[in-house]
Each structure stands twice: as structure tokens, then as C-alpha cells.
């Protein structure tokens, strides 16, 4: 994702990855500084970030951050299952064999840091019967679906229904 999260007029970069994500502040002149830890948007070592979007979810003029996470995966889990292809050897398992992972919504605090408001915003969708995360998010599209001036989010999932998060006009 790209966006000016700190309002300095320079486009910053957020990269998603397996095992943690990375926020790079644009210093100008083609130089970037990693500020992930200081900003509080790295996620955990077991996260599998797949995409992200900078979006002003609370209409306060600064860019908040929505991050898609795919499944709860690790090398240890994958090796434990021991997937193999005949004649080839090592393989990776189907996504249906892994528990989903919650996406994250971070509110920009306006001082270079973000607060995780995922729970309050209702983006941590759980299976009502098991309590496990339902999402296996691959992509997010910010759009004002109802033309009320507040950005809503459409999230594309793998092997489970997609999500539409309607902005409640209160930061959630």
C-alpha cells in the first residue's frame, strides 16, 4: 500500500509479507526509513499479510491502515502435516486445511503511531459456532458504497465468503 501516513507530502510504503509487515517512511530523495515497530503496525511473527490499504476510515484527515491477513501458517505447522506430491516431493497444503486469520484496522494517531482498533471496528469476524477467525483475506477495496462521505471496505477472502464492512461513521 502507498500513502502519506504522516502528512509530510511524501508517499510512504507499507509492505505485507509472511511473518510480519513493514512500514517505510519516505525521507525524500529516494530514501526510506523503516518505522514499523515505532508505528505499531508490524503484526505478529505468525501473520501472513496479503494486502493493505491506506484509507481515512474516521474522516479526520489522516490515513488509517487496513491490513489483510490470510491464514495461520508457519513452517512448523506445514512440516507437521507433511504434504507431498507424488514424484515431486515437498508440497504445501490447501488453504482449507488452515485456520483463517483476522484482518487488522489501525487508526492513525496523528503522531507517527497507530492504534489497533480491529476489535472495536468489528473486522475480527469469528465463526459463531467455533469462535475461530473466519477471514482468509487476500485483498481490500476501499469504496464509499452508499455515497455518505465515509469510506467502506470490501474484503476478498479465499475459500470463505467475502466481507463488506460498512463504515458506522464513528471510526468503526
Q: Could you say what each language-model-derived stretch is?
A:
Residues 1-172:
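Acidic, glycine/proline-rich Ca2+-coordinating loop motifs
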Amino acid at each position: 500500500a502507498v500513502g502519506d501516513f504522516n502528512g509530510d507530502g511524501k508517499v510512504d510504503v507499507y509492505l505485507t509479507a509472511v511473518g510480519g509487515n513493514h512500514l517505510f517512511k519516505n525521507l525524500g530523495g529516494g530514501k526510506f526509513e523503516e518505522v514499523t515497530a515505532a508505528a505499531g503496525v508490524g503484526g505478529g511473527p505468525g501473520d501472513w499479510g496479503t494486502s493493505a490499504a491506506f484509507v481515512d476510515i474516521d474522516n479526520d484527515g489522516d490515513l488509517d491502515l487496513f491490513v489483510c491477513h490470510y491464514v495461520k501458517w508457519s513452517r512448523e505447522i506445514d512440516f507437521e502435516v507433511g504434504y507431498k506430491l507424488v514424484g515431486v516431493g515437498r508440497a504445501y497444503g490447501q488453504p482449507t486445511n488452515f485456520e483463517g486469520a483476522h484482518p487488522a484496522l489501525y487508526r492513525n494517531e496523528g503522531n507517527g503511531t497507530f492504534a489497533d482498533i480491529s476489535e472495536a471496528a468489528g473486522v475480527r469476524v469469528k465463526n459463531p459456532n467455533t469462535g475461530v477467525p473466519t477471514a482468509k483475506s487476500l485483498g481490500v477495496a476501499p469504496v464509499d458504497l452508499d455515497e455518505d462521505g465515509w469510506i467502506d471496505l470490501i474484503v476478498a477472502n479465499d475459500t470463505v465468503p467475502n466481507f463488506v464492512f460498512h463504515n458506522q461513521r464513528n471510526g468503526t
